[in-house]
A protein has these predicted regions:
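ASCE P-loop NTPase motor core, strongest for the SF2 helicase catalytic module
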Residues: 1-169
Length: 169
């Protein structure tokens, strides 16, 4: 994703319920249509909003125009590297054995996940090249010392969008 002005990010902020999710999904669908080989896009949102992202994509877009992968819950469990396949020296610390399988994104062009999942699997997410990252309810990453903020900053992403329906300080 390149811009004429070499901007690396944007903020999309307005009141709740005015269509930010739809606007971002439309942008993603446009980017995929324009460049089918584009790197996947990452959407990080609170757990309470993940289903909204899925519902909006199903409601307004054909399944093939926005191939989605939800990296949360049961779907996330199927993407994990089994603990017994990780070096025994790392197995002693549960925080060090949270990895996702190689090529875990598959054919998905949009990956939906939570802030907690991004934090817990930061190395696997950071190992993936992303064309776009959307942080929904971006106030979750305003504390620079927080682990979730650090995980978000480690992502290998070309363009970032902070999205919020909460007044920005």
């Amino acid at each position: 994703l390149q811009t004429d002005y070499q901007v690396r990010g944007a903020v999309l902020a307005d009141d709740m319920g005015l269509g930010k999710t739809f606007q971002l999904l439309a942008l993603m669908a446009y980017l995929i249509e324009r460049e089918p080989s584009i790197e996947p896009m990452l959407v990080v949102a609170p757990v309470s909003l993940l289903e909204n992202w899925v519902d909006e994509s199903r409601k307004f877009f054909h399944e093939n125009s926005l191939p989605l992968l939800t990296a949360y819950g049961d779907a996330l469990a199927s993407l994990r590297v089994p603990k017994n396949q990780i070096d025994q020296r790392l197995q002693a610390d549960d925080n060090l054995v949270r990895f996702l399988r190689p090529n875990w994104v598959g054919d998905a062009k949009v990956v939906l996940t939570t802030y907690e999942t991004l934090r817990d699997f930061e190395f696997s997410f950071a190992g993936q090249k992303w064309s776009l990252m959307v942080c929904d309810e971006a106030q979750r990453i305003k504390n620079p010392a927080a682990m979730v903020t650090r995980a978000a900053k480690k992502q290998n992403v070309a363009f970032k969008i902070a999205c919020t329906g909460t007044p920005v300080e």
